[in-house]
Amino acid sequence: MIELDYLTIAFGGAIGAVLRYLVSRTINSLLPFSYIPLGTIIVNSVGSFFLSFLMFAAIEKVPLSKEAILFFGTGLLGAFTTFSTFTYETLSLIEESPARGVAYALANLLFAFTCAYFGMILGRGKV
């Protein structure tokens, strides 16, 4: 039922968006001296880990229902991670300092892909 799919995604997305706001705001307030927005790096990395873990575990070990994938993958983790904030912050930092902006972009990608890789390994049960 398509309408239920939308509600499932919306409910997961609402939770993910609030969690992202809380985590990112908390990290950035604890580390106000940081030269880059660490909150975004952390939410993107954590979200990448859990999405990879969820999807690889669902494919190879424990089949998940369509509703669980929509709720956790598309909804919660989709809203928890934030590509748009990452790109905005990168451009803002590049305007201030090109080196800092590029370093931020590379750090975000490096940490997110590394966490996604470990999520894949753990999701497949290789550890």
Curated annotation (Swiss-Prot):
Na(+) binds at residues 78, 81. This is Fluoride-specific ion channel FluC. Keywords: Cell inner membrane, Cell membrane, Ion channel, Ion transport, Membrane, Metal-binding, Sodium, Transmembrane, Transmembrane helix, Transport. It is found in: Cell inner membrane. Its main location: membrane. It is a multi-pass membrane protein. The chain crosses the membrane at residues 4-24, 39-59, 68-88, 102-122. It catalyses: fluoride(in) = fluoride(out). It holds the Pfam family CRCB. Na(+) is not transported, but it plays an essential structural role and its presence is essential for fluoride channel function.
